[in-house]
C-alpha cells in the first residue's frame, strides 16, 4: 500500500486477483470503506468484512473472478481527480464509464455513490476514480 488510499482500494483487489489471491486488505479510512462498499454493490469485489489485528482494523474483501480462466473483475482503473488537479463535475457532466460497463465513484454530500445514482439524484461531486471490466 502506498500513500494514496483511494488508489489502493482499487489497485489492491486488481493485483490480488491477478496473482490468484482470495482476499485483500486495504487501509481503513472513511473514503476507502465507502468506495469498497460501492465496489461490492457493483460486483467488482465480494464478501466485505473487518479484520482486527491488535488495536488496528482493516477492511478485507474477497476477490471476484469471471469465467473459467478466473480473469479479474477489475481489469482497468483510472484516477481522474488527482491531489494536484481536482475535478468536480456537475451531475450532467459525470461521464458514463465505458458505455455503462464500468462505474465512477464520486463522493457526494450524501456519501460515496455510483455514477448512475449521482446522475439520478442530480448530485455532483469529485470524480476520483473510474473502474471497469
Swiss-Prot record:
Keywords: Chloroplast, Plastid, Ribonucleoprotein, Ribosomal protein, RNA-binding, rRNA-binding
Pfam families in UniProt: Ribosomal_S8 (PF00410)
Subunit description: Part of the 30S ribosomal subunit.
Function: One of the primary rRNA binding proteins, it binds directly to 16S rRNA central domain where it helps coordinate assembly of the platform of the 30S subunit.
Protein name per UniProt: Small ribosomal subunit protein uS8c
Protein family (similarity comment): Belongs to the universal ribosomal protein uS8 family.
Subcellular location: Plastid, Chloroplast
Record-linked SUPFAM superfamilies: Ribosomal protein S8
Protein origin, superkingdom: Eukaryota
Positions of the UniProt region annotated as Disordered: 1-23, 44-133
GO biological process: translation
InterPro entries the record matches: Ribosomal_uS8, Ribosomal_uS8_sf
Biological source species: Selaginella uncinata
GO molecular function annotation: rRNA binding; structural constituent of ribosome
GO cellular component: chloroplast; ribonucleoprotein complex; ribosome
